[in-house]
Amino acid sequence: MKDISRRRFVLGTGATVAAATLAGCNGNGNGNGNGNGNGEPDTPEGRADQFLTDNDALMYDGDITDETGQDEVVVVTGAGNNGFAFDPAAIRVDVGTTVTWEWTGDGGAHNVVSEPESDFEFESDRVDEEGFTFEQTFDDEGVALYVCTPHRAQGMYGAVIVE
C-alpha cells in the first residue's frame, strides 16, 4: 500500500509540474517584446526602426537623429559612397518643422516618395541635379516613411518621426 501511495504522489507531482509548464507556454504573447500582441511596433521609434531595418536602409545604424527644436532640417539625398542613401536616414522633428531634402548629384536621379504605411503623403520629382531641393512641412504628429523609388533595391530609405 505504501508503494502505491508513493507512485500516486510522484505521478501527481509530475502531472502538476507538466501542467504548470504548459500553462506558462500557452500565453497570448507573440514573443516580439513590444507588448501589443499584433507583431507591429507600437511606438513611432519602433515603426521607423522596423521600416528601415526590414528594408536594409543604407546609413541607418539604429540611431534616430534628434532635430527637435529646429524650424528647418536638411536631409542629404544621394549620400554615402555610392550616392544611394539619405543622411541622416532617420530623424526626429517637432510638429511644424520643414524638412528639406537636398540632392548631392551623386548616384543618379533620385526622388523622395512616401510609402503606403507612412502617416504622410508626399512625392518629389525624379532629379539628378546637384543642389535641387524638395521641402515638406510636417503639421501633424506621425511617422513619415519614404523611399527613393529608383534606388529601392539599393536600400535608399528614410524616416521622419514628427512629435
UniProtKB/Swiss-Prot annotation:
Q: Which residues bind Cu cation?
A: H110, C148, H151, M156
Instruction: Cite the Pfam families for this sequence.
Output: Copper-bind
- Family matches, as InterPro entries: BlueCu_1, BlueCu_1_BS, Cupredoxin, Halocyanin, TAT_signal
- What broad class describes the main subcellular location of this protein? membrane
Q: Which UniProt keywords apply?
A: Acetylation, Cell membrane, Copper, Electron transport, Lipoprotein, Membrane, Metal-binding, Signal, Transport
Q: Which GO terms describe its molecular function?
A: copper ion binding; electron transfer activity
Task: Report domain Plastocyanin-like positions.
Answer: 48-163
Any signal peptide, and if so, which residues? 1-24
User: PROSITE patterns this protein is in?
Assistant: COPPER_BLUE (PS00196)
Localization per Swiss-Prot or TrEMBL: Cell membrane
- Mark out the compositionally biased spans (Gly residues): 26-38
Region Disordered: start-end pairs: 26-48
Chain positions found as N-acetylcysteine: C25
The UniProt entry lists membrane topology as: Lipid-anchor
Its function, per the record, reads: Electron donor. Binds one copper ion.
| Name this protein carries in UniProt | Halocyanin
* Species of the source: Natronomonas pharaonis
Q: Which gene encodes it?
A: hcy
